[in-house]
UniProtKB/Swiss-Prot annotation:
Binding site for L-glutamine: 53-55, 112, 140-141
Key words of the record: Glutamine amidotransferase, Hydrolase, Lyase, Pyridoxal phosphate
PANTHER family documented for this protein: PYRIDOXAL 5'-PHOSPHATE SYNTHASE SUBUNIT SNO, PYRIDOXAL 5'-PHOSPHATE SYNTHASE SUBUNIT SNO1-RELATED
Native source organism of the sequence: Natronomonas pharaonis (strain ATCC 35678 / DSM 2160 / CIP 103997 / JCM 8858 / NBRC 14720 / NCIMB 2260 / Gabara) (Halobacterium pharaonis)
Enzyme nomenclature, EC number: 4.3.3.6, 3.5.1.2
UniProt function note: Catalyzes the hydrolysis of glutamine to glutamate and ammonia as part of the biosynthesis of pyridoxal 5'-phosphate. The resulting ammonia molecule is channeled to the active site of PdxS.
SUPFAM superfamilies on file: Class I glutamine amidotransferase-like
Descriptive protein name: Pyridoxal 5'-phosphate synthase subunit PdxT
Oligomeric form and interacting partners: In the presence of PdxS, forms a dodecamer of heterodimers. Only shows activity in the heterodimer.
Gene Ontology MF: a single term: glutaminase activity
Gene Ontology BP terms: glutamine catabolic process; pyridoxal phosphate biosynthetic process; pyridoxine metabolic process
Gene Ontology CC: cytosol; glutaminase complex
Biological pathway: Cofactor biosynthesis; pyridoxal 5'-phosphate biosynthesis
Gene3D superfamilies the record matches: 3.40.50.880
Organism classification: Archaea, Methanobacteriati, Methanobacteriota, Stenosarchaea group, Halobacteria
Amino acid sequence: MLKAGVIAVQGDVAEHADAIRRAADRHGEDCTVESIRSAGVVPECDLLLLPGGESTTISRLLAEEGIDEEIEAFAAAGKPLLATCAGLIVASRDAKDDRVSTLDILDVSVDRNAFGRQKDSFEAAIDVEGLDEPFPAVFIRAPLIDEVDAAVETLAAVDDRPVAVRQDNVVGTSFHPELTDDSRIHGLAFFS
């Protein structure tokens, strides 16, 4: 049985856990999901999710709890990791904001909240590499991926701007895939 971990210092933890379970079921995998709030659990996981929230707070809490180094080691070990919205910011090489301590596990730079404020939130059906049908992406104070290293594959774009990327075992999205009933992004990141 696979063990999934959802970093639970902020964000849509329950929604991501549900999406992971649905994706695992769709792919014929048995999977348990554990919420992670302290060090020591990440190394036990087979797959890991770093959700959204507020990136400066997330990066601070990860460091305070000692989870940051465990996430870096997890990614370096080649295990599948999905980072969404603020999780993408924290996973990036450069958040262009000194208040965010990035993990540098995804070789991209991001511009926090580039898609606007809360009132500028939107939904869009986007084409995603590896999915047969468009995905209903929800953008809430979403970051813009503005620099992508050659080792990073762009999986989806909005107005020619990357919003989903993959580098080896790490997938990052600007949007919130957990806020829909569609678990295909979780399936793409973890079970494809």
